[in-house]
Curated annotation (Swiss-Prot):
The glycine decarboxylase (GDC) or glycine cleavage system catalyzes the degradation of glycine. The P protein binds the alpha-amino group of glycine through its pyridoxal phosphate cofactor; CO(2) is released and the remaining methylamine moiety is then transferred to the lipoamide cofactor of the H protein. It comes from Arabidopsis thaliana (Mouse-ear cress). It is found in: Mitochondrion. One of its GO terms (cellular component) is mitochondrion. Gene3D superfamilies: Aspartate Aminotransferase, domain 1 (3.90.1150.10), Type I PLP-dependent aspartate aminotransferase-like (Major domain) (3.40.640.10). This is Glycine dehydrogenase (decarboxylating) 2, mitochondrial. Expressed in leaves. Detected in roots, stems, flowers and siliques. Homodimer. The glycine cleavage system is composed of four proteins: P, T, L and H. InterPro entries: GcvP, GDC-P_C, GDC-P_N, GDC_P, PyrdxlP-dep_Trfase, PyrdxlP-dep_Trfase_major, PyrdxlP-dep_Trfase_small. It catalyses: N(6)-[(R)-lipoyl]-L-lysyl-[glycine-cleavage complex H protein] + glycine + H(+) = N(6)-[(R)-S(8)-aminomethyldihydrolipoyl]-L-lysyl-[glycine-cleavage complex H protein] + CO2. Disruption phenotype: No visible phenotype; due to the redundancy with GLDP1. Gldp1 and gldp2 double mutants have a seedling development arrested at the cotyledon stage even under nonphotorespiratory conditions. Residues 1-72 form a transit peptide. GO terms for molecular function: ATP binding; glycine dehydrogenase (decarboxylating) activity; mRNA binding.
Length: 1044
């Protein structure tokens, strides 16, 4: 292995030296180049000298022969200097030419012409108005400030699952605004993800402790969809034998509607009744959902209710409130089977509906039926505790249509914020907040009774007071004039929900609202001593929670700051290096894009506030919808789906609703290529569709004749085709327009998965190709950061004939943007009207700053970067699929299958070794087992592309040493990877290679290296010994003592 190290060093250094000479001599080269220095970091001087961008000549012109004569300045030199595309698209014009030449093309455009089929190529893409040229960064900030000023943030007492909260500044600045947290990917590579894995384990512990159930996932999209997932679990637990699901009318209306929509695909009947009228006599009820506390504030004792349900073979789902559970008897102690809810009020802003981390907790008995990611405890190669994602065989990327859910990663960033909020406040701090909120609600209720102008509900409550009066609308209007939002339930009923941000002064203002013009003879402060706890002792929590030291140590800002950074330092993010995951598009999340996300005028808006108070948001939605229509060639967009998986489901439900409207109830067959993302068949199954798989040919294209035969065989029942373009194999299929025609000729609709939209924007479009509906992953193509596993957004675009069926909402009606002439919405997809509205400014600013030209260039450079890397690697690794002219799209697959026989090396070994080089591995063994799929994106510099290629080439040399017999097949630098400091600095070293080579296999690592913090994690051990919460301190100490 020492020889491998020397050869790798020699090759890299030789190339760098030769390139330096060529730069000095002013030579152009077709050879791959990197920066002038072997370090990945380039000085500002050399950067200016060697990477000048967008400069075609001098800014000045000379009017005479000598330098002393007058010079005039060009108009171009006076234009704004803070244009954005040159900051996002990393390759300079010179580098673009170099890389295109290296790939065998005269220039970038000839490469693109040879890659994108002419039959689907757009002449150009053009936006209307100011967005076509693209706003500068300063103009964009000014524009967003103007939009923010149009949002009128009233004091909210609406509740309904959304509450104002104080986001601790230490969490806001160091997690929500910190790219080291928000640019991470889902923690598939556990060894370089231990920080967020620990934080997500903390989250799961918060959920299990507060709900009283032993298992929780690491987040779901929102409370409404979490309830729908629980409904599906009840159906699965009883193996589909009972087809009725009962929802108590005390649940939030958005939750009821989301469940009703989801039930259609499972052929479930949803019955909504008053809780006292729940009836199981039909014998067909699989589950029942109740709210605790209820949507109108009531706190009920569910003890006998749960016993009765279980006696009738019915599973009980409770939707709950985490803050309330610090005071209320936990659902697990009632015997609830599944508990769902949102962690929003634990330090996550409302953000006009999201993103927020929801949760689902259940018993060990149902753990394999749970949806979503679950973090578990395992051990690493040294026997030390390490964390990983557990039980992945349940998930869609493995089980496809047999998966527990189509959900992928959900809301990891927000789950981390929720967990840190609990860590910061601890059990006593959380209880103090809850008692204060309850006390303010109680003082308000007491004051209303003294006023005598309205009646207060007599049932116990936590934070929400139900008020009945003669004219609720008049009170609602009076409150609005004082910039206060109440919940208007009906003409005689109002609810008032209190939260962490409510003050005694706010309560006094409420007294004035309800006093009907009469003077108020008391204050909230004067009434406070008279209020007694409104929660009966039978419903008061007695069991302890959050007893682990982590929740009892970090209560000062300094301590929490250090804990956050301790975890952050364990995780690789885009702050460190490129993350070349195929089909994931880990591109730049620019600072200007991220700034508005934490502005109070965007963060503090309740999703059910009257739309006239949210005109800034509404204007942005309209602009964004129209821009996305231009980009995709569609006629209308829905912004409601709050994840890519949610977008897939929504798009297929639109197709289903369309067929239903035409009387084609029998159309339920969905054709899906075997190479499709796992979410595709899982989403189709959720819509009640029958899946017909079609294969691919040797070149990675859909087998068109097989597709034609499948479509014709199912023409009477064909609902849809799901297709990804470019294909998941990383090529532009020449026959895509023919594929669309085949489906349409046989009565189906074409659903395009937008995962690879980064290779379409400005060059072609789903609508132009022939698709009828497509979801966009805004967290891929349009720059929303991945957040370590969420948030994301999956809005759907449709052709005109499908626009009437776009989803709406029971509280704030919504539809397509632009709005179609007629509407017949399919139902409700997510809990909030516009999904995770708070992160939409990210995509909006990206599109607006790039302009049509910048976006088109981004697609071109993404394709160029992929082809350049494929060319550099092709003599070391087989590139599996190419288009008709020998090029790839924006991603490509390298084949490692042969190494299993020649050296005993698997893709996992290569991915783990890349960690020692400071990189996250590409996508492993998908869509083809035994391969790696690489996607560089347009925002990675040529120097970074070269560095990654150098790492893979060096690893190939390491493999060759095994093949030649110079390294042990079972004990080598790849099988031993990654190499954390704890291993390298141990007293003993028994490896047949040196510590130095294990740690520093490439020259750039000497100046800057990201260190994995654990050895290779044992996946099998973790699933066989499943632990998904923090262990009690004494067990941890015992484990540490044993491993030592």
């Amino acid at each position: 292995m020492e020889r491998a190290r020397r050869l790798a060093y020699r090759g890299i250094v030789k190339r760098l030296v030769n390139e330096t000479k060529r730069h000095r001599n002013g030579e152009s080269s077709l050879l791959p180049t990197t920066t002038v220095t072997p370090s990945r970091y380039v000085s500002s001087v050399s950067s200016f000298l060697h990477r000048r961008r967008d400069v075609s000549g001098s800014a000045f012109t000379t009017s005479g022969r000598n330098q002393h004569q007058t010079r005039s300045i060009s108009v171009d030199a006076l234009k704004p200097s803070d244009t954005f595309p040159r900051r996002h698209n990393s390759a300079t014009p010179d580098e673009q030419a170099q890389m295109a030449n290296y790939c065998g093309f005269d220039n970038l455009n000839t490469l693109i012409d040879s890659t994108v089929p002419k039959s689907i190529r757009l002449d150009s893409m053009k936006f209307s108005g100011i967005f076509d040229e693209g706003l500068t960064e300063s103009q964009m900030i000014e524009h967003m400030s103007d939009l923010a000023s149009k949002n009128k943030v009233f004091k909210s007492f609406i509740g309904m699952g959304y509450y104002n909260t104080h986001v601790p500044p230490v969490i806001l600045r160091n997690i929500m605004e910190n790219p080291a947290w928000y640019t991470q990917y889902t923690p598939y590579q556990a060894e370089i993800s231990q920080g967020r894995l620990e934080s997500l384990l903390n989250y799961q512990t918060v959920i299990t402790d507060l709900t009283g159930l032993p298992m929780s996932n690491a987040s779901l999209l929102d409370e409404g969809t979490a309830a729908a997932e629980a409904m599906a679990m009840c159906n699965n637990i009883l193996k589909g034998k009972k087809k009725t699901f009962v929802i108590a009318s005390n649940c939030h209306p958005q939750t009821i509607d989301v469940c009703k929509t989801r039930a259609d695909g499972f052929d479930l009947k949803v019955v909504t009744v008053d809780i006292k009228d729940v009836d199981y006599s039909s014998g067909d009820v699989c589950g029942v959902l109740v709210q605790y506390p209820g949507t109108e504030g009531e706190v009920l004792d569910y003890g006998e209710f749960v016993k009765n349900a279980h006696a009738n073979g019915v599973k009980v789902v409770m939707a709950t409130d985490l803050l309330a559970l610090t005071m209320l008897k936990p659902p697990g102690e009632f015997g609830a089977d599944i508990v769902v809810g949102s962690g929003q009020r634990f330090g996550v802003p409302m953000g006009y509906g999201g993103p927020h981390a929801a949760f689902l907790a259940t018993s060990q008995e149902y753990k394999r039926m749970m949806p979503g990611r679950i973090i578990g405890v395992s051990v690493d190669s040294s026997g030390k505790q390490a964390l990983r994602m557990a039980m992945q065989t349940r998930e869609q990327h493995i089980r496809r249509d047999k998966a527990t859910s189509n959900i992928c990663t959900a809301q990891a960033l927000l789950a981390n914020m929720t967990a840190m909020y609990a860590v910061y406040h601890g059990p006593e701090g959380l209880k103090s907040i809850a008692q204060r909120v309850h006390g303010l609600a109680g003082v308000f209720a007491l004051g209303l009774k003294k006023l005598g102008t309205a009646q207060v509900q007599d049932l116990p409550f936590f934070d929400t007071v139900k008020v009945t009066c003669s004219d609720a609308t008049a009170i609602f209007d009076v409150a609005a004039k004082k910039e206060i939002n109440l919940r208007l339930v009906d003409s005689n009923t109002i609810t008032v929900a209190f939260d962490e941000t409510t003050t005694l002064d706010d309560v006094d203002k409420l007294f004035e609202v309800f006093a009907s013009g009469k003077p108020v003879q008391f204050t909230a402060e004067s009434l406070a001593p008279e209020f007694n706890n409104a929660i009966p002792s039978s419903l008061t929590r007695e069991s302890p929670y959050l007893t682990h030291p982590i929740f009892n140590m970090y209560h000062t800002e300094h301590e929490l700051l250090r804990y956050i950074h301790k975890l952050q330092n364990k995780d690789l993010s885009l702050c460190h290096s490129m993350i070349p995951l195929g089909s994931c598009t880990m591109k730049l999340n620019a600072t200007t894009e991220m700034m508005p996300v934490t502005w109070p005028s965007f963060t503090n808006m309740h999703p059910f506030a009257p739309v006239e108070q949210a005109q800034g948001y509404q204007e942005m939605f309209t602009n964004l919808g129209e821009l996305l229509c231009t980009i995709t060639g569609f006629d209308s967009f829905s912004l409601q789906p709050n994840a890519g998986a949610a977008g897939e489901y929504a798009g297929l439900m639109v197709i289903r609703a369309y067929h239903m409207s035409r009387g084609d109830h029998h159309r339920n067959v969905c054709i899906i290529p075997v190479s499709a993302h796992g979410t595709n068949p899982a989403s189709a199954a959720m819509c009640g569709m029958k899946i017909v798989a079609v294969g691919t040919d040797a070149k990675g294209n859909i087998n068109i004749e097989e597709l034609r035969n499948a479509a014709e065989a199912n023409k009477d029942n064909l609902a849809a085709l799901m297709v990804t373009y470019p294909s998941t194999h990383g090529v532009y299929e020449e026959g895509i327009d023919e594929i669309c025609n085949i489906i349409h000729e046989n009565g189906g609709q074409v659903y395009m998965d937008g995962a690879n939209m980064n290779a379409q924007v400005g060059l072609t479009s789903p609508g132009f190709i022939g698709a009828d509906v497509c979801h966009l992953n805004l967290h891929k193509t349009f720059c929303i950061p991945h957040g370590g596993g969420g948030p994301g957004m999956g809005p759907i675009g449709v052709k005109q004939h499908l626009a009437p069926f776009l989803p709406s909402h029971p509280v704030i009606p919504t539809g397509g943007i632009p709005e179609p002439e007629q509407t017949s919405p399919l139902g409700t997809i997510s809990a909030a009207p516009w999904g995770s509205a708070l992160i939409l400014p990210i995509s909006y600013t990206y599109i607006a700053m790039m302009g049509s030209g910048g976006l088109t260039d981004a697609s071109k450079i993404a394709i160029l970067n992929a082809n350049y890397m494929a060319k550099r690697l092709e003599s070391h690794y087989p590139v599996l699929f190419r288009g008709v002219n020998g090029t790839v799209a924006h991603e490509f697959i390298i084949d490692l299958r042969g190494f299993k026989n020649t050296a005993g090396i698997e893709p996992e070994d290569v991915a783990k070794r890349l960690m020692d080089y400071g990189f996250h591995g590409p996508t492993m063994s998908w869509p083809v087992p035994g391969t790696l799929m690489i996607e560089p994106t347009e925002s990675e510099s040529k120097a970074e592309l070269d560095r990654f290629c150098d790492a893979l080439i060096s690893i190939r040399e390491e493999i060759s040493q095994i093949e030649k017999g110079n390294a042990d097949p079972n004990n080598n630098v790849l099988k031993g990877a990654p190499h954390p400091p704890s291993l390298l600095m141990a007293d003993t070293w028994k490896k047949p290679y040196s510590r130095e080579y294990a740690a520093f296999p490439a020259p750039w690592l000497r100046s800057s290296k990201f260190w994995p913090t654990t050895g290779r994690v044992d996946n099998v051990y973790g699933d066989r010994n499943l632990v998904c919460t923090l262990q009690p301190a004494n067990e941890e100490q015992a484990a540490a003592a044993v491993s030592a």
